[in-house]
A protein has these predicted regions:
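Extended, hydrophobic alpha-helical segments in both membrane/secreted and soluble proteins
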Residues: 1-2, 202, 209-216, 220, ...
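Conserved short alpha-helical segments that host acidic/polar catalytic motifs at enzyme active sites
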Residues: 2-132, 138-201, 205-206
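A polyampholytic, Gly/Pro-enriched intrinsically disordered region
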Residues: 33-44, 273-279, 345-354
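PRPP-dependent phosphoribosyltransferase catalytic core
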Residues: 55, 68-69, 84-86, 91, ...
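Active-site proximal loops enriched in glycine and acidic residues that flank catalytic Cys/His/Asp
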Residues: 80, 91-92, 112-114, 141, ...
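Terminal amphipathic helices with adjacent charged low-complexity linkers/tails
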Residues: 143-159, 204-238
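Short glycine-rich phosphate-binding loop at a beta-alpha junction
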Residues: 195-208, 326, 420-425
């Protein structure tokens, strides 16, 4: 739509990529702003040389950005530098993508992550400001810096996946939030292992899950403290020093079982090479697990495709001969695609979606897929603001536990006989841990913009038609 609008305006963009379209769009309104000022000053009988200087001084960056981004949809941080010396950084009106800045008498620096600025500029986190949603940080050639509204603000739906996985865990708030995500899973873990701490080894899948793992261990320790307190009270006045020592020594067994080759990044690998790559990423620490006695509990930050679990992690954990393997995800089920800057747009790649399909097949409800397809096709005929997510009713047929159970089956290789369980974060606990980043469309299907709803319906159409293309 933006591309066609440029054509209608008389522009000739050389390609349809997001970057080129945005550049052409802003460039068009920059030209228009320059022409407006030229006509204004020409009527005042200034010379062309004088007009050039006056345009550079009076160009209204806020106005041109307001006009250029009127029809933008999605999550974005856009930075631009103009030839005469003005610059800007603009954030989407829903605050989907993060942006922070620091300024003093000499410098202005903007980045998507606060710790990068803190490290580079050696400043306290309180000195780094968050760029407000729908605003642009405008840096004039003369050194004046202002935050100006460029697009009406929408409800804040900052991306929660940034907090779970993508952003650096060295940010103070993100670190605490990831710990909280792990801690909130402790009760579900205790239930799964039947509170058998003595025969359970706790570990994590390196390396982004490490902070959530610390939180999980703290949460498990709190549960253990409750057990120890109860035992001490039961002993009463008959307690001996040996009894007390034995009870107080009862602690979670915390080990580093999985070891990762830092040179291999599987999430960002292309589809063709990922399956082969993950087979060689992990190794394990031997000699810690009691064969056929110990349960292994491993924290992961999120489970998107399930490829790493199926092709590597569970295979190699199986060689340790545990009684049971429990994989814990600090994120809820990733059920829906993203179109706001993270390339996760093919539904067939999501293990949660594949679990849903398998459940529908098992229950003889495949006709519902046809219904969803028809609904999606109908949605495409509607104006964007009237579109609705036509996939949510499929997930609503099953509980989170049913889908998790099917996921556990899908990520377990055929030759593995050890029982595998998967525990996921709940949506309410996600929001409890990350209260300021409530954008949860990956998990809930509640997209903050009309463009997101169109993408999820198109993604399902592509899946149903066997079309292996991005949905946007």
């Amino acid at each position: 739509e933006l591309f066609q609008e440029l054509v209608d305006l008389g522009q000739n963009p050389k390609e349809k990529s997001d970057t080129v379209t945005v550049l052409e769009k802003i460039g068009h309104f920059l030209d228009d702003e320059v022409q407006r000022l030229f006509n204004w000053f020409k009527a005042e009988n200034y010379s062309n040389q004088q007009i050039n200087t006056l345009i550079a001084e009076h160009i209204d960056v806020q106005r041109l950005l307001q006009r250029a981004c009127r029809k933008f949809d999605g999550g974005y941080i856009m930075a631009g530098l103009m030839g005469h010396g003005d610059a800007f950084v603009m954030r989407d009106p829903s605050a989907i993508r993060p942006a922070f800045y620091y300024q003093d008498d000499e410098i202005v620096v903007v980045a998507s992550e606060r710790p990068a600025i803190q490290t580079c500029m050696n400043v306290h986190h309180t000195e780094v400001q968050e760029l407000k949603r729908g605003h642009a940080l405008i840096i004039k050639k003369n050194g004046k810096v202002t935050e100006e509204l460029c697009k009406d603000q929408l409800p804040r739906t900052a991306c929660s996946f940034e907090r779970i996985y993508f952003s650096r865990g060295t940010d103070r708030d993100i670190y605490l939030e990831r710990k909280k995500l792990g801690e909130l899973l402790a009760p579900a873990i205790m239930k799964e292992i039947d509170s058998d701490i003595e025969n359970t080894v706790f570990s994590f899948i390196p390396n982004t899950a490490e902070v959530a793992y610390f939180g999980m261990v703290e949460g498990i320790q709190k549960e253990v403290d409750k057990i120890n307190k109860k035992k001490l009270l039961e002993l009463g006045t008959d307690a001996t020093e040996e009894d007390i020592d034995r009870i107080l020594s009862f602690k979670p067994r915390v080990e580093k079982l999985a070891v990762k080759d830092e040179k291999m990044r599987t999430f960002i690998a292309d589809d063709a090479s990922r399956d082969e790559l993950v087979k060689h990423v992990y190794d394990v620490t031997y000699g810690i697990v009691k064969n056929n006695v110990d349960t292994l509990v491993l924290m992961d930050d999120s489970i998107v495709r399930g490829t790493t679990l199926r092709e590597s992690i569970i295979n190699i954990l199986n060689t340790l001969k545990p009684k049971k393997i429990v994989i814990v995800s600090s994120a809820p089920h990733i059920r829906y695609p993203d179109c706001y800057g993270i390339d996760m747009s093919k539904m067939k790649n999501f293990v949660a979606f594949n679990a849903l399909i398998e459940l529908l097949k098992k229950d003889g409800k495949e006709d519902l897929l046809k219904k969803a397809y028809g609904d999606c096709k109908h949605q495409e005929t509607l104006p964007p603001e009237e579109m609705q997510n036509a996939i949510q009713f499929l997930y609503a047929r099953y509980t989170d536990e049913q889908i998790s159970e099917k996921i556990a089956q899908l990520v377990t290789p055929a030759h593995v006989t050890v029982p595998v369980k998967v525990i996921y974060q709940t949506l309410p606990d996600l929001h409890k841990a990350c209260p300021n980043n409530n954008g949860d469309w990956y998990f809930s299907g509640n997209y903050p913009t009309a463009g997101g709803v169109r993408v999820v319906n198109r993604a399902f159409i592509n899946f149903f038609e066997g079309n292996n293309e991005r949905a946007y």
